[in-house]
Amino acid sequence: MSYGLDSGDVLEAEDPFIILLVEDNNAHAMLIMRAFERLGFTGRIEWLRDGKAALDYLRLHEGGGRSLPRMVLLDLRLPKVDGHEVLSQIKRSERLRAIPVVVLTTSTSDDDLRRAYSNHVNSYLIKPLSFEDLKRTVEEIKEYWLGWNRSPGPA
């Protein structure tokens, strides 16, 4: 597996399970990807640093012919287009709305929480401060969303 620091970097493996990670903080993104790797995730993580890049990526893949992500990990405080707008556009799209979106943010604001759920977020989690706590959070995300949860996937 390889790590990079540029928008559009990919953590690749053979399993077709794709997670779209939308995170502008390099350190947070690296820790999240490292936690998935240490937990034995064998899919692919596609990391984008801003909301516009995420929407462009999803629009490109939405048309068919390319694999859509099976889960989106979304920060709210993003450059260019904020996470709330990314979430709103995902959930308004007939083809994308079934993709689980997990907000992973530092925001503890009740307004952000209410707004995310009004836009049909699947889960809202606060980023832990330590790597060990983040690793536990990622482990729980992986166990629930990639293990127990069943979803129909994109339309």
Curated annotation (Swiss-Prot):
Keywords: Phosphoprotein, Transcription, Transcription regulation, Two-component regulatory system. The keyword Disulfide bond does not apply. SUPFAM superfamilies: CheY-like. The modification 4-aspartylphosphate is found at D75. Phosphorylated by FilI. Pfam families: Response_reg. One of its GO terms (biological process) is phosphorelay signal transduction system. Residues 18-142 form the Response regulatory domain. PANTHER family: RESPONSE REGULATOR RCP1-RELATED (PTHR44520). Member of the two-component regulatory system FilI/FilRs, which is involved in the regulation of methanogenesis. This is Probable methanogenesis regulatory protein FilR2. It comes from Methanothrix harundinacea (strain 6Ac) (Methanosaeta harundinacea).
